[in-house]
């Protein structure tokens, strides 16, 4: 548990104006100090489907029962095929909290009905809307190396797991993670705003050197009953994030994203700079906030990747380098850390990616064991 200095919380003191918030954060900090040993980790199920896809990345809770989707189940996207080549995974599995696994979608790159530059390699970018649409990012490779990585797209699937549309273009370049403000209804109407991190802007050409081309793009969708989502606008709201290719991780750059409870901030895991930043007014801004404002840096963070905002506003992230999960208050105070995976050398490195909070619990995927797990 670590405190950060005054510079790191600059610009965020307004979040703490209410006494209620201060008291709540104090309670969270006290609980984190006293409850650590009582936490348990339970393996729910393997994430490996029949075709052998591995390396689970994205995870999201199904918000509404429709088609093949069952409310409360978890959808998980796989980044690797059975060959263990990164950027070749083609499946999304659905797992119930009791551990029953079914195949939600197998997206055949040889028979893709839509445009997706380079093919299929499903990333952490995964959302499920109340209207039944599932949207997943693709950052494909042909041989598992960054040399063959291509721009990909966002694939839009219906509630039966069938691809009906793709979102692509110059602003979509290696979609790595994603969250959404869902204003859709169960009958299919309404709207949604997607927030996508992109990590391939100049990275492949730099051959491992750091470039500052990572972006966060807002995609405004109009949803109509009986029709595929319609893209009304795409806006770069964050830019200049550090990114580079990596022989082990394929690519490193801005990863997890999550909206604050009031929608006034979009938190971004700035992995290479080992910090969490906030982009102000993400739902309405029409220009880039560059890399936003630093919420917290260093401390227990160690290559923050997946990010999720809990109902109480606390920011949960998982580290790529040591297997720890870190909890950070909106003020920037790191209130707790827990080790979710200690396997490998160094312990926990490369094991964690996607996570989602449900009440007082956290579901997360473990790449080292190819499993869905529950922390509570």
Placement of each model-derived feature along the sequence:
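N-terminal secretory signal peptides that target proteins for export/translocation
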Residues: 1-14
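Bacterial N-terminal signal peptides
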Residues: 17-28
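Surface-exposed loop and turn segments in beta-propeller and other repeat-based domains
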Residues: 34-52, 97-120, 156-175, 222-225, ...
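Beta-rich, blade/repeat-based domains predominating
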Residues: 48-72, 87, 108-134, 140-141, ...
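Short loop/turn segments immediately following the C-termini of beta-strands
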Residues: 79-81, 138-141, 149, 183, ...
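Structural signal for beta-propeller blades
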Residues: 84, 92, 154, 203-204, ...
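Beta-propeller blade signature
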Residues: 89-98, 149-161, 211-222
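Loop/turn-rich, solvent-exposed surfaces of beta-rich toroidal or solenoidal domains
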Residues: 271-275, 294-338
């Amino acid at each position: 548990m670590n405190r950060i200095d005054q510079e790191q919380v600059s610009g965020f003191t307004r979040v703490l104006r209410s006494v209620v918030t201060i008291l709540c954060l104090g309670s969270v900090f006290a609980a984190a100090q006293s409850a650590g040993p009582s936490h348990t980790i339970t393996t729910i199920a393997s994430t490996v489907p029949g075709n052998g896809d591995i390396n689970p990345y994205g995870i999201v809770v199904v918000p509404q029962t429709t088609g093949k989707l069952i409310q409360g189940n978890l959808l998980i996207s796989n980044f690797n095929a059975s060959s263990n080549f990164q950027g070749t995974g083609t499946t999304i599995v659905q797992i119930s909290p009791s551990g029953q696994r079914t195949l939600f979608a197998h997206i055949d790159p040889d028979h893709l009905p839509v445009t997706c530059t380079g093919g299929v390699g499903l990333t952490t970018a995964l959302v499920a809307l109340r209207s039944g649409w599932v949207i997943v990012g693709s950052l494909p490779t042909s041989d598992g190396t960054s040399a063959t990585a291509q721009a990909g797209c966002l694939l839009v699937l219906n509630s039966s797991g069938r691809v009906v549309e793709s979102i692509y273009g110059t602003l979509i370049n290696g979609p790595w993670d994603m969250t959404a403000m869902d204003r859709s209804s169960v009958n299919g109407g309404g709207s949604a705003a997607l927030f996508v991190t992109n990590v391939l802007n100049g990275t492949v050409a730099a051959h491992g050197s750091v470039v500052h081309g990572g972006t966060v793009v807002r995609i405004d969708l109009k949803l109509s009953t009986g029709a595929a989502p319609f893209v009304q606008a795409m806006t770069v709201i964050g830019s200049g994030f550090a990114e580079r290719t990596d022989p082990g991780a394929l690519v490193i750059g801005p990863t997890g994203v999550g909206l604050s409870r009031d929608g006034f901030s979009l938190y971004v895991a700035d992995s290479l700079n080992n910090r969490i930043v906030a982009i102000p007014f993400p739902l309405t801004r029409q220009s880039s906030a560059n890399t936003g404002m630093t919420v917290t840096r260093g401390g227990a963070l160690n290559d923050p990747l997946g990010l999720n905002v809990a109902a109480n506003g606390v920011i949960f992230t998982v580290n790529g380098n040591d297997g720890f999960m870190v909890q950070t208050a909106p003020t920037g105070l790191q209130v707790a850390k827990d080790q979710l995976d200690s396997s490998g050398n160094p312990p926990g490195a490369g094991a964690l990616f996607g996570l989602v909070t449900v009440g007082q619990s956290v579901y997360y995927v473990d790449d080292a064991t190819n499993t869905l797990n529950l922390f509570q």
